[in-house]
Amino acid sequence: MATSEGFMEFIVEQAEGAGHISTKRMFGAYCLYCDEKPVAFIGENSVFVKPTEKGRAFIGDVTEGELFPGSKLWFIIEERFEERDWFSELIRLTAGELPQPKPRKPRAGKKKYLMN
């Protein structure tokens, strides 16, 4: 599910009105975060948005597909991401329905063993 960095940057610009937008590379694609909530994946010149009730109502005629074989179905946005106001509203609505991320536990340091 490779995608170019330029396409990812374009999608980030399109979503900027939704809140604090960031990305993280994973699974050969980019995960799109809005206010620290994972709302979409960017890959293969498409955007896969996490399904929510408000998102479904906003989109209307939804196209769904697997992010990867065997995954849950996601909303596939193939062209409407070019409409900045529409796309940022979809991302904002999606993030609004998702729970706050759980705080990450600090990583435990390596144990040191003393040899006698």
Task: Annotate the PLM regions.
Residues M1-N116:
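Charge-dense, helix-prone N-terminal extensions
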